[in-house]
A protein has these predicted regions:
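C-terminal edge and immediately downstream basic/flexible tail or linker adjoining helix-turn-helix-like DNA-binding
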Residues: 3-6, 68-96
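Amphipathic alpha-helical segment used for protein-protein interaction
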Residues: 2-31
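Generic detection of well-ordered alpha-helical segments
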Residues: 12-15, 32-33, 64, 68, ...
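DNA-recognition helix of helix-turn-helix
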Residues: 52-77
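Short amphipathic alpha helix immediately N-terminal
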Residues: 24-44
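Hydrophobic positions on the alpha-helical face of helix-turn-helix-like DNA-binding modules
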Residues: 34-35, 47-49, 59
Length: 96
């Protein structure tokens, strides 16, 4: 799956599915926070920067890294993801 397709699919998931995926895949704390604030709380780059004490100019790159980490976990470490999270991962991976 291309990075662009992955991003589009993340945006189409329900909030419940996103919450389960973000909290249940074993992301690093910073990645989890970034994705949560952006997708669940709907915060802007400026708000995220303020909340996390980072420069707003670095939020985009940090989010890209967090999405890349999530994609890597889903692609390469799927067997480590808890069983209760896997149905939500399947939703993300379904072709639309």
């Amino acid at each position: 799956m291309t990075e662009s397709d992955f991003n589009k699919r993340l945006k189409t998931l329900s909030l419940i599915a996103l919450k389960v995926i973000i909290k249940g895949t074993g992301l690093k704390t910073k990645s989890e926070l970034l994705l949560w604030k952006f997708y669940i709380e709907g915060k802007s780059y400026y708000e995220i920067a303020d909340d996390l004490g980072i420069k707003s100019s670095s939020v985009g790159k940090a989010l890209w890294n967090a999405k890349k980490e999530l994609q890597t976990i889903i692609s390469n470490e799927k067997e480590l993801i808890p069983d209760e999270v896997k149905p939500y991962i399947e939703l993300l991976l379904q072709k639309q």
